[in-house]
């Protein structure tokens, strides 16, 4: 997917979960909106290079959005977790996710389940079972190992319960971990951070829920990030 026009700055601090202060090259201080409400472990330390977009909306209190971080080790992370669904949709449309490539119809944000949920994507195909796909963002990486979650996620636990129920009804059910960090080539669940989520995911796999994680690649033009896209399946370590 193509990124909007981005500007760079130096990260000063993140606070109140949704906000971050950055310094431009000319010394001006800006406050950015941060769409990622997680712990963002290792995704933004003071002094890192931040890339942000600017909205034309006149109603937004904070028109600038934190999009990416270039870490001191040279790796890049997409901070805007709203991009994960856009990335996944593009990958589904382009048949990049080979495990789901046989489906022709992609329905986003469909209400389902018994806990007042919405599935990220409902896939349909001729003579195929309906496939419920829940997308999660992977931004937490240690030693080239992608981890999810980076904080306790009761919402994620609810989604797993819903997927287990869909599988028991005869549908396909998938948890899709979309890489937003280009530094990992394997994936696992962060048991030490959310043991309840880890236990539920293990149960889901036993019930037949499918787990896939895909890596991400960033394109640059003249040292400026211009696009990102999902590339290939990475190993899932149970």
UniProtKB/Swiss-Prot annotation:
Signal peptide residues on this chain, from the entry's feature table: none
Classification via InterPro entries: SfsA (IPR005224), SfsA_C (IPR040452), SfsA_N (IPR041465)
MF annotations from Gene Ontology: DNA binding
Coiled coil: none
Pfam families, per the entry: SfsA, SfsA_N
Protein family (similarity comment): Belongs to the SfsA family.
Name this protein carries in UniProt: Sugar fermentation stimulation protein homolog
Organism encoding this protein: Histophilus somni (strain 2336) (Haemophilus somnus)
Gene: sfsA
């Amino acid at each position: 997917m193509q990124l909007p026009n981005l500007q760079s700055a130096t990260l000063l601090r993140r606070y109140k979960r949704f906000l971050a202060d950055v310094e431009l090259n000319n010394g001006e201080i800006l406050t950015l909106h941060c769409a990622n409400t997680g712990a963002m472990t290792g995704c933004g330390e003071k002094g890192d290079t931040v890339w942000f977009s600017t909205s034309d909306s006149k109603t937004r209190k904070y028109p600038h959005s934190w999009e990416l971080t270039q870490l001191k080790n040279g790796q890049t992370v997409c901070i805007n977790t709203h991009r994960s669904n856009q990335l996944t949709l593009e990958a589904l449309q382009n048949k990049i996710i080979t495990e789901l490539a046989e489906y022709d119809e992609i329905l986003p944000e469909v209400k389902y389940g018994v806990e007042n949920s919405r599935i990220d994507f409902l896939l349909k195909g001729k003579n195929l079972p309906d496939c419920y796909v829940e997308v999660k963002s992977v931004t937490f990486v240690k030693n080239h190992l992608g981890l999810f979650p980076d904080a306790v996620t009761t919402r994620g636990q609810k989604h797993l319960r819903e997927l287990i129920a869909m599988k028991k009804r005869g549908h396909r059910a998938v948890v899709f971990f979309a890489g937003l960090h280009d530094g990992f080539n394997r994936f696992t669940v962060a048991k030490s951070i959310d043991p309840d989520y880890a236990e539920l995911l293990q149960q889901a796999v036993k019930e037949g829920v499918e787990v896939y994680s895909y890596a991400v690649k960033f394109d640059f033009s003249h040292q400026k990030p211009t696009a990102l896209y999902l590339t290939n399946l990475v190993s899932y370590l149970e």
